[in-house]
A protein has these predicted regions:
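Elongated alpha-helical scaffolds
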Residues: 114, 119-130
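Glutamine-centric residue-chemistry signal
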Residues: 8, 52, 125, 167-168
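Solvent-exposed loop and beta-edge segments used for protein-protein assembly and interaction
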Residues: 75, 115, 122, 149-151
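Solvent-exposed functional surfaces
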Residues: 118, 133-216
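Short, well-ordered amphipathic alpha-helices
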Residues: 64-68, 128-139
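Short, flexible loop/turn elements at secondary-structure junctions
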Residues: 85-87, 123-126, 135, 159-163
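Short, conserved acidic/polar surface loops in the N-terminal third of protein domains
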Residues: 92-97, 130-133, 168-170
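N-terminal extension/subdomain marker
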Residues: 1-78, 83-101, 108-111, 117
């Protein structure tokens, strides 16, 4: 659909990596759904514009189901969703809260306007699409209170602004190449122990032995 209006982000400017400023912040599920897009890898394209693997519908539906079941505790959002806006000019719309104190670690506001183009999902495309699918299902089922609750939940995001699609793809590569290969063995053992002690509630994780694929 057409983007309705501007979106206000609350951000902290964190670090500069390979010439790009990285911001952390929060926006609502509603705003994310409205501004996001996916740069899918199409090997025949020249020049290449995308790098994301094809959506895994099963994974998206799993996340949507879990989202609808646990609207008070959205597990899909435990990790930040990374987005990039391919518009260097967007920096003009980011303002330090205190204009005499524009620094790393400082608070900023970003007034996003539709003419800046879409926010491309760098990491978290399945989670973002899962939230979108959950919203559609709640809408179709006329569960408007639940829909409202989901859409107004805040999401933890990591934001970059670069027109350089190669740098955007490199960010994706770094996240996936290094971060995802971590063995969760230690955490899994703690979860099993917590479950056996009755002190935690992730029974579905421990009993399904499906720890890795559920949240991605």
């Amino acid at each position: 659909g057409i983007m309705s209006s501007k979106v206000q982000f609350n951000l902290i400017k964190v670090i500069n990596i390979f010439g790009i400023d990285f911001y952390n912040g929060a926006i609502t599920v509603k705003d994310l759904i409205e501004i996001m897009d996916i740069a899918e890898f199409k090997p025949w394209e020249s020049p290449l514009k995308g790098y994301q693997r094809k959506n895994n519908e099963q994974k998206i539906n799993q996340i949507a189901e879990r989202t609808i079941k646990n609207l008070d505790s959205l597990e899909a959002l435990v990790d930040a969703i990374n987005i990039n806006i391919r518009q260097k000019d967007a920096e003009a719309y980011i303002k330090p809260l205190d204009k005499n104190n524009d620094r790393y670690g400082g608070f900023h506001t970003f007034t996003y306007i539709p003419s800046l183009g879409k926010a491309f999902l760098v990491d978290g495309q399945h989670r973002a699409k899962g939230l979108q699918a959950a919203a559609s299902k709640l809408q179709n089922d006329k569960k408007f209170n639940e829909l409202d609750k989901l859409l107004n939940t805040f999401i933890n995001i990591s934001l970059t602004l670069t027109e350089d699609v190669y740098k955007e793809a490199y960010t994706f590569y770094l996240i996936n190449q290094y971060a995802k290969s971590v063995s969760p063995e230690g955490a899994t053992r703690l979860m099993v122990e917590g479950f056996e002690n009755g002190s935690v509630e992730f029974q579905n994780e421990v009993t399904s032995h499906n720890t890795k694929t559920t949240i991605d």
